[in-house]
A protein has these predicted regions:
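Conserved C-terminal guanine-recognition region of P-loop GTPase G domains, centered on the G4
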Residues: 44-45, 67-134
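Conserved G1/Walker A P-loop phosphate-binding module
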Residues: 1-59
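Canonical P-loop GTPase G-domain recognition
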Residues: 112-163
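Conserved protein kinase catalytic core
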Residues: 26-27, 57-58, 89, 115-116, ...
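Glycine-/small-residue-rich active-site loops that bind phosphorylated ligands and cofactors
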Residues: 2, 56, 85-86, 113-114, ...
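A short hydrophobic beta-strand->loop->alpha-helix junction that borders the nucleotide-binding pocket
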Residues: 8, 52-53, 83-84, 137-140
Length: 169
């Protein structure tokens, strides 16, 4: 019994690069049932990996958001890719996914770009605030992929800290 691993993130956070890093070459791209939206599925260690459209939320205001929400609800675990440079914007989606109660792991991507802009993110603190494993990655340079694969096994439902919720709202 393989798990369903679903990748979720805002547009342009590097999700497809993660998808390729996890699944390798064999990718099956089809349309979501009843739509023209592409859905990519691949395999990773006997699990199924599904990429979702880039969305800013899952409140189902748009077709993409509704579909992403349905896919997340059917997932065994979620890898939420967030952009370290736009952390606050991206955490809005992270918190919505946490609300759905699905075990997840956060890939904090583009930490190299964030560092260039002088942004240093305290990963341990973020992990505490979200209640899920957080992995720093710079996936275009292949940084953090192995650690992510390692930590996927420790995915768990989040427990966001009240302080964080206040900051984001």
């Amino acid at each position: 019994g393989g798990k369903k691993i679903v990748l979720v993130g805002n547009p342009n956070v590097g999700k497809s690069v993660f998808f390729n890093a996890l699944t390798g070459l064999y990718v099956d791209v089809s349309n979501y049932p009843g739509t023209t939206l592409d859905m990519a599925c691949g395999r990773y260690n006997g699990d199924v990996v599904i990429d979702t459209p880039g969305v800013y939320g899952v409140s189902s205001f748009s077709e993409e958001e509704g579909i992403t929400r349905d896919i997340v609800l059917a997932a065994d675990l979620v890898v939420n890719v967030i952009d370290a440079v736009h952390l606050e914007r991206d955490l809005f989606l992270t918190l919505q996914v946490i609300d759905m109660g699905i075990p997840m792991v956060v890939a904090l991507n583009m930490v190299d770009e964030a560092a260039r802009e002088g942004l240093k993110i305290n990963v341990d603190l973020l992990e505490k605030l979200l209640g899920v494993p957080v992995v720093s990655t710079a996936v275009v340079h292949n940084v953090g992929i192995e650690e992510l694969k390692e930590r996927i096994r420790f995915a768990r439902p989040g427990q966001p800290d009240d302080q964080l919720l206040k900051k984001i709202e």
